[in-house]
Regions:
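Short, glycine/alanine-rich hydrophobic alpha-helices that insert into or span membranes
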Residues: 1-25, 103
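Secretory-pathway/luminal and periplasmic proteins that interact with or process carbohydrate-rich
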Residues: 56, 73-77, 134-138
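Conserved binding/catalytic microenvironments
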Residues: 47
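Alpha-helical transmembrane signal-anchor/signal-peptide segments
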Residues: 25-37
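Solvent-exposed, membrane-proximal periplasmic/extracellular interface segments of envelope transport
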Residues: 63, 67-106, 110, 114
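Membrane-cytosol interface motif
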Residues: 38-44
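Amphipathic/coiled-coil alpha-helical interface segments used
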Residues: 1-7, 23, 32, 116-182
Length: 182
């Protein structure tokens, strides 16, 4: 037993602890974001997976979905930036606002993927998602079938976080936060 071996063990344990803590915080953020935008952890997990495969970070996707949720609600009331964009895409804001988020995104993606000039897609994405819209052009261009395929792949790979698992991780993270606050 040498000092080098002991030090390597300590460094490894600290690294593993930090990795676990980061994983817990990421799951906690997923659950809190899902709750904030009125969706499930399962739906948000699938949407994040599809976004990641098309080059969009989870942070960007989360902000885009928050803005899309708000703008869709405004459009359903007859106001806001998204009103004209949704109409141009042939989507009914009042119907969209009553759908689960993943269904809203599937309907939007299907309408968005229809042949239109790239500049028009970009302009529509900005109206629907604000500045995060540019990042989502490739995700939306997949269409309903492409997104559904990615959702199924996420389930197959086990990257979809259940509500029960997310709730348990949130409790663990809250307990760790309290512990480290003392």
């Amino acid at each position: 037993f040498s000092m080098k071996t002991a030090l390597a063990g300590i460094v490894g344990a600290v690294g593993l602890g930090l990795l676990i803590r980061q994983s817990i915080q990421t799951t906690d953020a997923l659950a809190k974001t899902a709750s904030k935008i009125g969706t499930t952890t399962e739906e948000l997990s699938k949407l994040r997976y599809a976004a990641d495969l098309t080059g969009v970070s989870a942070t960007t996707m989360d902000m885009a979905l928050q803005r899309f949720t708000r703008r869709t609600a405004e459009a359903a009331k007859g106001t806001g930036e998204a009103k004209a964009a949704l109409k141009e895409l042939g989507l009914d804001a009042k119907a969209l606002v009553n759908m689960p988020l993943s269904e809203r995104m599937l309907a939007l993606s299907d309408a968005f993927s229809e042949a239109r000039p790239e500049a028009e897609k970009l302009a529509l994405a900005f109206k629907l998602f604000d500045s995060e819209g540019a990042a989502l052009v490739n995700t939306l261009a997949l269409g309903k079938d492409g997104l559904n395929a990615m959702f199924a792949e996420a389930e197959t790979l086990g990257v979809v976080m259940s509500k029960l698992a997310a709730d348990n991780v949130q409790k663990a993270n809250d307990a760790l936060t309290r512990l480290f606050t003392l």
